[in-house]
Amino acid sequence: KNDSVSAIVITSSLPIFSGGADISEFSGGDLSPMLPEVLDKIENTSKPVIAVLPGPAFGGGLEVALACHHRVTFADNKVGLPEVNLGILPGAGGTQRLPRLADAQTALTMIVTGKPTSVLKLPGVFDKISDKPEHLLEDTKAYLASLSGPNAVKRTCDITLSMSEETQGVFEAVTAQTKKASKGFFAPLKCIEAVRGAYTLSFEDGLKNEGKLFMECM
């Protein structure tokens, strides 16, 4: 612990936060520490962790942001979880954390289609949205100064979801639509199954289910 540090900011010096994993590393040797382990450490840090997105965040990059306690970006930015286009699903908690911050329809659409989404459509995901990227630093400092008490550390994993009748209807509609559109491509249906776990399982069991389904796609 360093008492001189009051908060941690995760950002990028480039005009992109992160494009996600380098899939060429999957066939390599030791990959430790694995991203889910890193994100668990981030999420359970006792000091506020803020993801500041100066540009797009995709795949594992967005999963990093979702594991942080707060997220700041700018209005024209886009984020996404495109893993389905590789025949897999988000494997570092994306199927569990995104539904806890966005509504079921939004989370399912993002994960099942893999399409980029405007941050303006994700008010529950981002705590502060600057009007321009050049205002990010100033706005982040102001946001940091506003953090205090129990709101300083907001762990996404602590949010509890339940499968309401309305949410069940969303799952049924998305599943029916996906079965028609996927034409035997099974990754989108695995994505739905993983997201369902966010509503029917504990966070820990949901992560295990996500990992199992991820391996079934490999």
Q: Each predicted region: which residue ranges?
A:
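Hydrophobic, secondary-structure "cap" segments at the distal end of domains
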Residues: 95-105
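Glycine-rich beta-to-alpha active-site loop
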Residues: 42-86, 90
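Short, well-ordered coil/turn segments that N-cap beta-strands
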Residues: 5-6, 47
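Glycine- (often His-adjacent) and acidic-residue-rich active-site loop
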Residues: 4, 11-41, 57, 85-88
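Amphipathic alpha-helical segments at domain termini/boundaries
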Residues: 15, 19, 63-67, 107-213
